[in-house]
């Protein structure tokens, strides 16, 4: 089986100092010249940090808590993934061009690769981040289900690649730090996955207020109910079961696996954890952003 898997650097390559999927960068001019609109809302995460969760919450806010409207289509059609390109199957730019305003735009890009038009049009941006140890666990399982991705081999080997920034979208450290710098702009809201798990009501209200809407109790209740982990895991519009099996193998692992804080404890042997934490401290010592790896 493994011999038929694509080689790692056949699929991914260095792009302006960031490891990227070559399918995405093949048509980079389309991304770079993308024309943002002033009322676009950009939702940014490093991969496996809760983009589907926060995206569904934001879409519920835009649709004023109308669950049926949110169930009219898969999330990847309602919130197009800007740089995603899989030849004829998925084209985020094309989807966005065809969307009426106001658009919600998803991206995993580090700040330096974001199309300039988002800054020029002064678009609102939500950046959601998650602690690195849980991200790497979730990313490992994601690698196992994406058909075009190479076999990640052992978890410890994947962690080494993650620490080196040799996974798609590059270094987690650089990504977080680049967006933290941008969050000094009042149009950028910097959020934490762990805060959402701790007190979802507080964080939903924060999102609603950032989007300059009224956080009515009834709306907040509907959003919390509809975007609970179990609801989203069972919802075909959010669990990625609408993607063709040629792209994703959900029999290996569900797209929405656990949705908890601290699952890293079930995967990191002690020696690997110590090595990871030493590496983490070295790279984050000058960054004021503090993460919680457990609640």
Curated annotation (Swiss-Prot):
| Documented EC number(s) | 2.8.2.4
Annotated residues that bind 3'-phosphoadenylyl sulfate are located at: 48-53, 130, 138, 193, 227-232, 257-259
The protein's matches in SUPFAM superfamilies, at most eight in alphabetical order, are given as:
P-loop containing nucleoside triphosphate hydrolases (SSF52540)
Cite the record's tissue specificity text: Liver of young mature males and uterus.
Record's catalysed reaction(s): estrone + 3'-phosphoadenylyl sulfate = estrone 3-sulfate + adenosine 3',5'-bisphosphate + H(+); (24S)-hydroxycholesterol + 3'-phosphoadenylyl sulfate = (24S)-hydroxycholesterol 3-sulfate + adenosine 3',5'-bisphosphate + H(+); 17beta-estradiol + 3'-phosphoadenylyl sulfate = 17beta-estradiol 3-sulfate + adenosine 3',5'-bisphosphate + H(+); 3beta-hydroxyandrost-5-en-17-one + 3'-phosphoadenylyl sulfate = dehydroepiandrosterone 3-sulfate + adenosine 3',5'-bisphosphate + H(+)
Q: Tell me the residue numbers annotated for binding substrate.
A: 106-108
Molecular-function annotations in GO: estrone sulfotransferase activity; flavonol 3-sulfotransferase activity; steroid binding; steroid sulfotransferase activity; sulfotransferase activity
Q: Where does it mainly reside?
A: cytoplasm
List the Gene3D superfamilies hit by this protein, alphabetically: P-loop containing nucleotide triphosphate hydrolases
The record's active-site residues are: 108
Does this UniProt record's set of keywords contain Lipid metabolism? yes
| Description of how activity is regulated | Inhibited by estradiol.
Which Gene Ontology terms of cellular component type are present? Answer: cytoplasm; cytosol; nuclear membrane
Residues modified as Phosphoserine: 156
From which domain of life does this come?
Eukaryota
Q: Which UniProt keywords apply?
A: Cytoplasm, Lipid metabolism, Lipid-binding, Phosphoprotein, Steroid-binding, Transferase
Q: Where in the cell is it found?
A: Cytoplasm, Cytosol
GO biological processes: 3'-phosphoadenosine 5'-phosphosulfate metabolic process; estrogen catabolic process; estrogen metabolic process; ethanol catabolic process; female pregnancy; positive regulation of fat cell differentiation; sulfation
Q: What does this protein do?
A: Sulfotransferase that utilizes 3'-phospho-5'-adenylyl sulfate (PAPS) as sulfonate donor to catalyze the sulfate conjugation of estradiol and estrone. Is a key enzyme in estrogen homeostasis, the sulfation of estrogens leads to their inactivation. Also sulfates dehydroepiandrosterone (DHEA), pregnenolone, (24S)-hydroxycholesterol and xenobiotic compounds like ethinylestradiol, equalenin, diethyl stilbesterol and 1-naphthol at significantly lower efficiency. Does not sulfonate cortisol, testosterone and dopamine. May play a role in gut microbiota-host metabolic interaction.
The Swiss-Prot or TrEMBL record describes its family as follows: Belongs to the sulfotransferase 1 family.
Q: Can you name this protein? A: Sulfotransferase 1E1
Supply the source organism for this entry: Rattus norvegicus
């Amino acid at each position: 089986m493994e011999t038929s898997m694509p080689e790692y650097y056949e699929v991914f390559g260095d792009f302006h100092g960031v490891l990227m999927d070559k399918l995405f960068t093949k048509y980079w001019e389309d991304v770079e010249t993308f024309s943002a609109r002033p009322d676009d809302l950009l939702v940014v995460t490093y991969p496996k940090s809760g983009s589907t969760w926060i995206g569904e919450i934001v879409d519920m806010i835009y649709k004023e808590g109308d669950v049926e409207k949110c169930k009219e289509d898969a999330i990847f059609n309602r919130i197009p993934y800007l740089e995603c390109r899989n030849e004829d199957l998925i084209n985020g730019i094309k989807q966005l061009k065809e969307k009426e305003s106001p658009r919600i735009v998803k991206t995993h890009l580090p700040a330096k690769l974001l199309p300039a038009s988002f800054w020029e049009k002064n678009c609102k941006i939500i950046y959601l981040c998650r602690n690195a140890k849980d991200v790497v666990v979730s990313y490992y399982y994601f690698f196992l289900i994406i058909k075009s991705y190479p076999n990640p081999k052992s978890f410890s080997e994947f962690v080494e690649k993650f620490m080196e920034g040799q996974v798609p979208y590059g270094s987690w450290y650089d990504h977080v730090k680049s967006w933290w710098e941008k969050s000094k702009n009042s149009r950028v809201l910097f959020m934490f996955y762990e805060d959402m798990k701790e007190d979802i009501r507080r964080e939903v209200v924060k999102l609603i207020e950032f989007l300059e809407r009224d956080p009515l109790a009834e709306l907040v209740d509907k959003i919390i109910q509809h975007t609970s982990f179990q609801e989203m895991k069972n919802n075909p519009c959010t669990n990625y079961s609408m993607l063709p099996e040629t792209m994703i193998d959900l029999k290996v692992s569900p797209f929405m696996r656990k949705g908890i804080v601290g699952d890293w404890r079930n995967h990191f042997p002690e020696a690997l954890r110590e090595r990871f934490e030493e590496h983490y401290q070295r790279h984050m010592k000058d960054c004021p952003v503090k993460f919680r790896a457990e609640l």
